[in-house]
Amino acid sequence: AIDKILNGEDVDLSDAVFVYELEPGEGAENGIAASKEGAVILTNLKCYLLQADNGVKKVWETSYKSVGAKESKEGDETTGGGLAWGGGCSPSLTKDLVMFTDNQDPVNLIAVDMKTGEQVASMPVIDELPEGTQVSVENSAIVYDDGEGTVSTIVCNWFGAGSAKLGEADNDSSI
């Protein structure tokens, strides 16, 4: 259907929309990325590579652990974190890797092989903070692949990235 759409042809999409059902308790809230390999979906429990042509084909799935949402306490001057359960971020892609965070304590950056889904690396990020500092990764990691074997990433802490007084008159979302 996509080739026909790109060629400007009229297309009946009723046979081109497919559904992949997740397990009970599993949800995909904001973790979606696409490449020529397929769609990478990050749920609160797993990372998937799906392809769709005449139905949905699961190429691989990789489980990971997460602690879910993180909340501010009453009286805090900043908002909390955890806009979504699970990794909290959308997957970042290179030609060979899918990278995402797990929102554990400390937060880990996980890299899985794009072709197989096998976890090839995991390391703590944003872990050299004072005791009790909350961390919530809510944006995709910035990824740079130099094409010669070095992949660099930047992961940001978004916990408290907005004003808790947003609902009050004369306030905005800045800290």
PLM region descriptions:
Residues 1-29, 33-175:
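Extracytoplasmic/lumenal domain signature
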